[in-house]
């Protein structure tokens, strides 16, 4: 790694002889040079704040808001994991047949969901600090691939980033050594928890995400935890009050540029370009979150009306089933019977009615027994741009 000195940090010489290598020690965020953001960046910041405010405001008027929150957390978990190469789909995540035992990628994403929930809960009890992040990391890697990488424990050895099979000498980036890591995390914690009255909270989130990714404080899971940290920062700074937002949406669509921008800050100190990219990414993600929420609410209203107008005496059970489908959009007859506490034959009749109304669709036409059904229009909204990167 070579750097053009622009206040972003220094290269540190470690060991000697054939074992010698350079690690990067980033400048503490409190000591950054004056940022010179463009007028366009300020306009994007303002637009992003307004769009996130619109999203927050919708929560007060949307029925069953908690259910939509759950789906959005799942989507963020999926998108962030896909950036790292996870091949799980949204249907995999929701399908009753794709258990964590049979699909390791599903287990990774489910753990991310649990980690988000844990982080938000911990924020109510303690400051956003290294101790909190360690607890969230322990959940993220609990019982899945990476378990051998000391979940919840800061690394005690040097790590590096580069192509598969590269050595520390040929790595494209070597994060701070152990001594510098401790100092970097202490500085980061102070920056997060000391008021920055003159700095927009979205800019703060951009800088904190960059600094965490550069510190790479764990042996595994740094990318996912770093993106989760964006949401925690926005909640911590009062921009958001919930996780009704999936910031990884645009990072995944522009994954190469996302990594290039992070690298550019380390090598050339291009903080302003990174902040502009970050703000644009969050703005586009917020726009998509608002649009999909409006579509989901519109679908709910149409489906409710369709059931009321067409199911007669079974409309009450139909409305109950709709509520179940909005939480579990992939189901089978046995699951419906158990959830509604009705007989299998009654559940089958209800499924048939929903098929005729176009609400449910069989996911596998070739199967007669144990057939699964999907709330297809609902799923299509959530699936948008959530396919794995091939």
What would you call each of these model-derived segments?
Residues 1-390:
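FIC/Doc superfamily catalytic core
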